[in-house]
Structures are given as structure tokens and as C-alpha cells.
Amino acid sequence: MKQSDDFERVSLGFFPTPLERLTTLGDSLGVTLDIKRDDYTGFGGGGNKVRKLEYLMADACRKNVDVVITTGGHQSNHARMVAAAARKFGMKPVLVLRGNQPGTYQGNLLLDKLFGAELEFLDPDGYFTQIEGAMNAHADAAQARGEKALIIPLGGATPLGALGYVRAIEEMNAQLKERGEPAPDVIVAPTGSGGTLAGLYVGARRYWPHTKIVGISVSAKADWFQTRISAMAQDCADLLEWPQSWTPEDIWIEDGFVGTAYGVPSDGGIDAIYRVAQAEGVLLDPVYTGKAMHGLISLTEQGKISAGSRVIFVHCGGSPALYPFAQTLLEH
């Protein structure tokens, strides 16, 4: 069997990130609550995708890539971090984003511009039918120029990228052992493309077999994620040569906290942003972590997360997305 450190990885983030106790919020919910501060990964504005990109950019460097192409939403944290990582290793970033070209560049779009990314915008209604062709067209254009291109899928959600969150479990395991504390009962994390959840599932089964993982969807329905994440977890475990078997029924997804659509702030998510900011001084965002925290709060209130549980919330970053939604937040 292999370990996550057996795979080639570049150094991008500042690890280990803190595992911070949220006493005020946890007490109000009747649980022991820690937050894994992957908003503090540091590189390119921080966030969970740094863990995945350490493996994915090592692959790009090994292949001597000139152009890195990826996709995401209008305010994609993943796309922003791919742009930063590409520049660090002397590669050109191309971002194909879901949404119309803005009149003003704010939040992650501003940072994309600062990193010098080439941006293409796809109409939201046709995005899913056009995205593969659009990214392939950029790869073909690079090849015609004599350059080598690499396409990184949405969210960096690949079995190789998922190793980043196997490593995160190993990191948290060491942090809890240093504290003299047991494994958590529950881990809660947002999911938009599935790679983070796949890595958490694989790592937890190895190190914390009794810990439940809850993915709070910010985009798709539960059954789509269950199929996708179980397949990715299986492929990730196979990479590691760990004897694990995964089915869709193994994956716990809550899809009732999306709101009207991906990338659109929800009332419950905004309430959670205010609550956490005013209870703990921690900033969440309206696209991912606000909705995921809304899910965590609701699941504790409903008893789906039992009173007295030890809970870890994975903060995947995304604070640049607060600013484009400033008026929505202030009018709430």
C-alpha cells in the first residue's frame, strides 16, 4: 500500500492549516465544533483547491506543460488558484467560466485578471453542452502554436487531486493526537465538484473508520454526487492500493441547502455568514461555506447530527466572493 506522500507533489500551500475550536458557536449548537482553516492555505488567495493543485501541478510540470486550461463558475475559487499556480510555474492560464462577461471585474474575477489569465465566458444556459468543446478548442489552439496544454477538470476533481484531502485527513489526525482528542464523529464540508469529498471519504475510512462525512451540495442533486464521489473515491483508493470498496450508498449528501441555484446566495447561507462572523470572527462566503454552514446548523437542529457530537467543519476558503455580493449581504 502507498501513502499520499508517495506521489509527486509541488509545494504551494502553508501546511498544516489550523484546526480551530469554535466554542461559542459549538456551545450554541450543543456540539464540540472545530473548523479546519483551509481558507489559510495561503497561496493565490487560499482555499481548499491548493491541496489538489499540489498534485495536479506536479503532473503539469512533469509533462512540461505550457498552457493550463480549466473551468468554473463566474466567481470560481478553483479557477483563480489554477491561474496563480500556472503563473508560479511559468505556464499560461486559460479560464473558461460559466457566466456572461461582466462590466466590472470584482472578487475572483479581479484576481484572475491580476494573474494574467485569458478568460472566456460561456452563456450559463449552454455551459454544460459547450464546456468540453470550448476547453478542447483552447488546447488545440495551443498545440497549433507548438505549445503543450493540460486541461484540469472542474474543481480539480480527479483521483489524483483527491489525494490532497487524504493528506488533509492525515494532517487533522496528527493535530487531534497532539491535543489528546479522539477522532471526530462527523465532518461537514461543502461540495461543488466532488473531489474534496472523495479524498475525505478515502482518508477517513483508513484513519477514522467510524467518522461520518457529510457533503453539503452547493450545486447538484444528491444522487449525482453519490455516483460521482463514490467512483472518484474508488479510483483514489486504487491509486493508493488501499483495499477499499465504494458504492453510491456509502456517500452522505444533503442537497437541500443550494437555494435557487449554484453561485446565487441563499437566505439561510447569508444568515449563517452573519452568525459565524458575529459569534467567532470567522468569514464565510455566500457560494460555498455559507451554504455548508447553514447545512451544519440545520442538521444539528434536526438531530441528524446528534447533540454532543464532535464535529469538524472544513472551511474551503472563498472570501473573495463576499465582495461581488456586498449589496445582497447588506440588504439581507
What residues fall within each predicted segment?
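PLP-dependent amino-acid enzyme catalytic core
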Residues: 1-332
